[in-house]
Amino acid sequence: SMQLSARMTGFPKSKRVKLKYVEEIVFSSSNLIQTYSFRTNSVFDPNYTGGGHQPMLFDQYAEIYNHYTVLASMITATPAPIISTGVVPSYFGWNLSTSANALTTDFSAVTYLLESNYTNPPLIYGNNNADSGVGLRTLNVVRAKFNAADFFGVTSPLDGSAYTALCTANPAQE
């Protein structure tokens, strides 16, 4: 959910809304650790790694309200392995960090991913091709929640300008 601040008369001064954002990510089939980063507290550009689009209806709200603050967000990710024979099992997980660079520096090997207390949960999946007899049949789903007040250690993210942004920018504190 996010809080919006109005810039036009005739509308409420602020409004809480829930917006939905969907992104499809394709990784190469290398043996290397691959990471992808999202901004948990931005609706202007949630996709840190690749850039992208805003959640549905964000542009319409941005015509009425000039600032936003993300109070909470949630991610649901489902790995969809390539359907072919000989696919090796893969590890899949998430990490919440104040720096997108932490992902690439901290998780340079699978062992770091599996041993980290900050990655939750490391899942293993394999080939989803039922006819090949290779790999695992079940796809795992990772869900995680972000609460801005808890994560940043503040009473309310609405109290600090570092967590609020113009509708044309990301917050200063990402």
Segments predicted by a language model, with ranges:
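Capsid-like jelly-roll
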Residues: 1-174
